[in-house]
Amino acid sequence: MRVAMMAAFAGAITFAGPAFALDKVTFGTNWVADPEAGGYYQALEDGTYAKYGLDVTILQGGPTSNGGMLLIAGKIEFFMGGDMIGDFLAVQNNIPTIAVAAHFQKNPQIFMSHPGVGLDKWQDLPNANPAFVSAGAVNTFWAWMRLAYGFKDDNIKPYNFNSAPFIAEPHSIQQGYLTSEPLEVERQGGFKPNVFLLADYGYTTYSTIVETRREIVEKHPDIVQRFVDASSIGWYHYLYGDNSKANEAIKRENPEITDDQIAFSIGKMKEYGIVDSGDTLKLGVGAMTDERWSGFYNTMVKAGVVKSGIDYKKAYTLQFVNKGVGLDLRPK
């Protein structure tokens, strides 16, 4: 398996080579190896990328990495971005990147509450005090929550990615990620928290968005198409097939992850339709639509997260998705 750390890269990977050679590309993830990138590891490990003529290196991210900058600098060809806000900000700041697929139809961002204390429904949460929210969230999804549901800034306490304060305060709420924090709370606190997926309450951004540079789309559309198709097939195989080799690869790259965590993450992605739901049921995994992009852009403008008047359509292209690739791989 060709997975490298960021320090190994001194220059851009080129596409040139003999006709019989696989096209070499590097895909950077936005975090350390985990099931949330499982479809890409699956496509690498089960030979799907090779079948599509690609020699893919997965460059795992982490707390000190910046794969987005590597993409801009030409050090990698594809990057696993976060949500659509980053793509809007790229347009706003004239950064020449573009979204070519969305492998999470729902953003896994959640809020959690303690059960049985009057915070069991979404409509109970705006008055919860304290609300443990990170600095980055205050100006993104919390801004939407404040506008759409009346959540209060006065209730915020800093969330430093440690759930102990939330566990200790029964009337608090805390942000989290569907596939990780609920299990952490269950392990450390001894209870199952209430989980509220923001996507189910109107936070309609895509996530795990495959990004590349505009020049690659213009000069090498065939490579982009093959990478998108193979990655989407990888996600079908990871969710519905034998994912053991991908999980072993994830554990090699991230020795701290446990089998329980992997199983929990995969289970939640399937239970909540993170990858395969909505438009993907007809268009295929990775699907995107103009309506979703325009709707979320308008929502973020109203919330003050992005500027009005930018050409948000430059943030993405539908050229490589919505072709039904892999639909036959979903269990009947």
Residue ranges with predicted function:
Residues M1-M6:
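Bacterial N-terminal signal peptides that target proteins for export
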Residues A16-P18:
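N-terminal signal peptide c-region/cleavage motif recognized by signal peptidases
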Residues F20, T48-K51, Y149-F151, Q188-G190, ...:
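Short helix-capping segments at alpha-helix termini
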Residues L22-T179, F196, T204:
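Short, glycine-/small- and polar/acidic-enriched structural segments
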Residues I85, F161-T258:
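Pocket-lining segment of extracytoplasmic ligand-binding domains
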Residues E218-V305:
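Secondary-structure end/capping motifs
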Residues D290-K332:
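Conserved C-terminal helix/tail region of periplasmic/extracytoplasmic solute-binding proteins
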